[in-house]
């Protein structure tokens, strides 16, 4: 039977006898864990033991697995060297079944509290600058038997069950800020307002959010505007918008951006109450004139 005392005894024996490991570089993560207070936060995430294994150590293994494991769905456990467990204070590697049990017992509220606290500590330590925030979403194919709406999977180019992830990232440091995971069928309009609220709680300062075309929704942009969040995103390509850009008089392309002519005008978006700034680049490629448009609610931003 595995108990905390038996784990500690076996761990001390392994350390006394010495070991070699391809994962020894992971020990350089120890100061980072101490800075962030990873042990304390994992204690609050799931205080109960999982089969006698301290949840803090199991949580550390999951974190390290994201660094050393393979991406995507795995059929076999590719980490078999027992010394890998020593990074998490364990004399062995917990099985995928144990990891899944760990995830299944974590309440969603605890997960969000963990991410909020982690984000706030990163901000305090200077790992997040919080000036420009990348906002994006991805669908990860799910093989769950649960009935759920289907989402479009861009990689596979099919509609299927998926886990919808919505996240924010600090553009300057490339560090993650917050993440939400939802079932298939969850749209950006449903998930992003709360995602922005959590990001604001972490950063504690106004920021500009860079988004993709999926966020081109008037009601969503209106909600973000009410929260005081500045956004910039590419204009959706449509015949209507192309004609609108082509109709801009040449005299309005008075500015330059990376050697390309730029017009700073205004446009309207359905379900958004006010005019939006419309930044239009005029590009000459392959003897053709092309237009690239961006919209923003930031009236003070310098193109």
PLM feature spans:
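An anionic, glycine-rich sequence signature occurring as long contiguous blocks
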Residues: 222, 227-303
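Generic beta-sheet signal
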Residues: 131, 207-209, 231
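Short, surface-exposed acidic/glycine-rich loop or hinge patches that mediate macromolecular interfaces
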Residues: 186, 214-215, 300
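Generic recognition of flexible, low-complexity loop/linker segments
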Residues: 153-155, 197, 219-221, 280-282
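Dynamic "connector" segments at or just before major functional cores
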Residues: 1-159, 165-185, 189-197, 201, ...
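Acidic, metal-coordinating catalytic cores used for nucleic-acid/nucleotide bond scission
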Residues: 209-218, 237-240
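Short helix-loop-beta connector
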Residues: 203-205
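Generic beta-strand/beta-sheet core signal
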Residues: 136, 179-181, 210-212, 232-234, ...
